[in-house]
Amino acid sequence: DGDATEAESIDSDALPDHVTGLIDHLPDDLTPEQRRTAVEFIKVHRSKFSKSDFDLGRTTLVQHNIDTGTNPPFKQALRRHPTAHLPVIDEHVERMLAADVIEPAVSPWASNIVLIRKRDQSLRFCVDYRQLNGLSRKDGYAIPRPEDCLRSLGNAKYLSTLDLRSGYWQAEILPEDRDKTSFVTRRGQYRFKVLSFGLANAPALFQRLMDTVLKGLTWETCLVFLDDIIVYSETFDEHVQ
């Protein structure tokens, strides 16, 4: 057991912090051999783990459309924000630009920014899409009920949870519909290139995407609820496969 821990420590020295953090959180009740197997699995697949909220992948399987029918564009009056919040908005916009999440826009559409205080008292950047959502044709794709997901776990003894980092930002919006996501700041006007939080049909599109990607595995070896995935197995060997 001591030898395994020492070897693991040496092998982990060259790994980035976000990967060693995963290793540190492996459950304590794994056997030494199971732990070695889990560590090796994480190391082999380390490029799949995101370093931050802005270290994103991008799928080409779907593109989100925003069907507003014949409704004309609207432009909301610029909302005033407390002076202390303006640097937060500026920083978030700069980070989204750098991550290719948004781009500058000249659009007849414009929704307002809102900052929502999270439990840790930090501020979440959001766009108020309620007016746009009221004009949008709704997607009826079903989202699984959490209680149905839990019942499907059955006799599973091994569970792994995966949370897609900024999952919505990994699916693109159709170029012709991006103007509809426009928002305005003191620095200028921007639009989303990828799925934005708060859009009416974002959950339906993302659930459909995940069900497509994991077709043949859902309800058999994994459960998917939007950007949360549970992998479940009765044995450890099945689990690492």
Each language-model region and where it sits:
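Intrinsically disordered, low-complexity serine/threonine-rich segments
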Residues: 1, 5-12
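Reverse-transcriptase-like RNA-dependent polymerase core
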Residues: 10-14, 47-74, 116-124, 141, ...
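Reverse-transcribing Pol proteins
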Residues: 13-141, 220-237
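Polymerase palm active-site segment centered on the conserved acidic dipeptide of motif C
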Residues: 161, 234-241
